[in-house]
């Protein structure tokens, strides 16, 4: 049963990777009524996968019994058996992804769609050496994938229109909001937008304009307060393209244009200031503060996800 209450076709879907992204992708597709097989080479991740899936069900107030539709395997072949779709969520290393896709191609039917969840590596490169490149594309889920609705469906120069259509239909029926990215550029759409803002934020802090906490406050309590209901192109049309041009004439020449990562970012990494996991990054964090941020984000996104599912079944 799809998220909008309609009957949809149950697919057999293989998931490569049961870690940070893979387990959430497995859950949301199982919740949509599909049979899921996860390949995870790490024994530790295989052992913890059932508990992590049950935690998602508890967070969303859903029946944990649906996780029984998800099987876990320590070898690739059984997880690919009979799959009509394969979603790869392996570490962000091109040689690894290319090797996995080459092995997967030998195990599945020619019409099986092969999708990579890479957040930056173009699917053109991942599938470059495959025989059936027309069925390869990118499906960039946002973390956590079971809570954030967007999926960037990115075609490459060889991807067929049928591959895009089938993938968009599957994701839409699972309650996601897929968007079609027509060119396979690094970072796709979302990460390019996100990192354009992050580059300017880092430059502002590095140059002493403000501190990191001020950046976060300005985003959350300023334009971020409307971003969920008003995208940047809508906002441009709302205030006027002419006004946007006037502002751009004054502002754009002063925005940061550092080629490559800002030296300030490199200095943080060199000093071991890696963020919440080390107690300091752009800001300082206690264990309690870090946990509060994670819990606040999870509860907020879960509330939105439950509201969307409730609205879809009315």
Region spans (language model):
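NAD(P)-dependent Rossmann-like dehydrogenase/reductase catalytic/cofactor-binding core
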Residues: 2-5, 32-34, 173, 207, ...
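NAD(P)+-binding Rossmann beta1-loop-alpha1 motif at the extreme N-terminus of oxidoreductases
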Residues: 2-59
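Internal alpha-helical scaffold of NAD(P)-dependent oxidoreductase catalytic cores
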Residues: 34, 153-184, 195-225
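Rossmann-like NAD(P)-binding element
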Residues: 41-44, 48, 58-113, 121
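Structural/interface elements that position substrates and couple domains in central-metabolism enzymes
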Residues: 54-57, 190, 194-200
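Rossmann-fold dinucleotide-binding core
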Residues: 113-191
């Amino acid at each position: 049963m799809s998220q909008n209450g309609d009957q949809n076709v149950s697919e057999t879907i293989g998931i490569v990777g049961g870690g940070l992204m893979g387990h959430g992708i497995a859950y949301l597709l199982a919740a949509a009524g599909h049979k899921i097989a996860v390949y995870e080479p790490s024994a530790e991740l295989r052992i913890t996968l059932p508990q992590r899936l049950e935690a998602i069900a508890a967070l969303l107030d859903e029946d944990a019994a649906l996780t029984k539709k998800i099987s876990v395997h320590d070898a690739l072949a059984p997880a690919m058996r009979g799959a009509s779709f394969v979603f790869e969520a392996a570490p962000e290393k091109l040689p690894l992804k290319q090797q996995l896709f080459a092995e997967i191609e030998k195990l599945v039917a020619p019409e099986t769609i092969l999708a990579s969840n890479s957040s930056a590596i173009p699917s053109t490169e991942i599938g470059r050496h495959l025989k059936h490149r027309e069925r390869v594309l990118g499906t960039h889920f946002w973390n956590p994938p079971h809570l954030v609705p967007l999926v960037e469906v990115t075609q490459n120069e060889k991807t067929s229109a049928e591959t895009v259509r089938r993938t968009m239909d599957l994701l839409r029926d699972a309650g996601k909001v897929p968007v079609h990215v027509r060119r396979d550029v690094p970072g796709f759409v979302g990460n390019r937008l996100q990192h354009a803002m992050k580059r300017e934020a880092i430059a502002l802090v590095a140059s002493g304009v403000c501190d990191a906490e001020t950046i976060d406050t300005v985003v959350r309590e300023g334009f971020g307060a409307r971003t969920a209901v008003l995208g940047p192109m809508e906002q441009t049309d709302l205030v006027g393209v002419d006004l946007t041009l006037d502002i751009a004439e004054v502002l754009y020449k002063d925005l940061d244009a550092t080629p490559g990562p800002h030296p300030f970012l490199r200095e943080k990494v060199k000093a071991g200031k890696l963020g919440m996991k080390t107690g300091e990054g752009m800001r300082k964090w206690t264990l309690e503060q870090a946990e509060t941020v994670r819990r606040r984000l999870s509860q907020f996104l879960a509330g939105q996800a439950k509201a969307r599912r409730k609205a879809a079944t009315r």
